Amino acid sequence: TLYGSLAATGKGHMTDVAIIDTLQPIAPVEIVWQPKVFLPFHPNGMTFAALDSNDKVQENWTVYSIGGGALAENNDNPTIESPDVYDMENMTEILQWCEDTGKSYWEYVKECEEEDIWDYLAEVWATMKDAIHRGLEAEGVLPGPLNLRRKASTYYIRATGYKQSLQSRGLVFSYALAVSEENASGGKIVTAPTCGSCGVMPAVLYHLQKSRDFSDMRILRALATAGLFGNIVKFNASISGAEVGCQGEVGVACAMASAAANQLFGGSPAQIEYAAEMGLEHHLGMTCDPVCGLVQIPCIE
């Protein structure tokens, strides 16, 4: 049973498809939609009930989707994921660490994470680029009743004909559209920090690499820094649009992209932090109220 915002937007986010694809090989699955019923802990609540042959409930599990792929059960059992790997919980402490050590944010990530973080980030970067490439090639209508047409390829072609002063903006826009349209179609993307805001980071980093010839290693370090900033918001506030509005999704994505871009251009830790702050504050107050529960309007349109 899907409750609240998870039920209201579940069709558009293909939540039911993900659940059925996962559980159907094990046993028959029935989805019950309860968009007007909100569970107490979080707007994105769901209950899994296992029934026997007599339709009697044998086990049930209530869990909440709190953003970026993370799950939580209730106030007594916080986020269900791997243990925290970062000793510091806010940007003030991390910025002070950078100033004391003379190191940057990505080096803090390197010290806290395992060595395979770079292999993981390489996979993330490859997935982001693949989503852009697929989105720029795809045409047609996005799934759902709105009949919204894909526009990334059209905007990309237009941007290539712009004068240099306008071309960068047009290209970044087309890249972001490409990834967002892939997400709306159920394609493979990276939560950055969420599915609804998945186009911002890839668009900015892809354009910077193509236009400025940044190496893959520099991009991976920028991703590490961006992830750190996103994690700070996730830990201290929320990246769930259902809980805090779009400011927690696109706003945080903009902050992450701003931090990454500033680092690529040689910004100091203080400048990187300030860039992220400005990126977030310009999105404060944005709500999450998608038409028909689809990640299309205003998420794309």
Predicted features along the sequence, with ranges:
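Non-transmembrane, aqueous-exposed alpha-helical and coiled segments at domain scale
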Residues: 2, 12, 42-44, 50, ...
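Acidic, glycine-rich active-site loops and adjacent beta-strand->loop/helix elements
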Residues: 2-7, 19, 35-37, 223-232, ...
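N-terminal loops that bind phosphate or other acidic moieties
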Residues: 18, 35-37, 54, 192, ...
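C-terminal regulatory domains involved in ligand/effector binding and gene-expression control
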Residues: 20-22, 28-162, 170-171
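Accessory "access/gating" subregions that flank catalytic or transport cores
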Residues: 129-245
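Hydrophobic alpha-helical bundle architecture
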Residues: 233-301
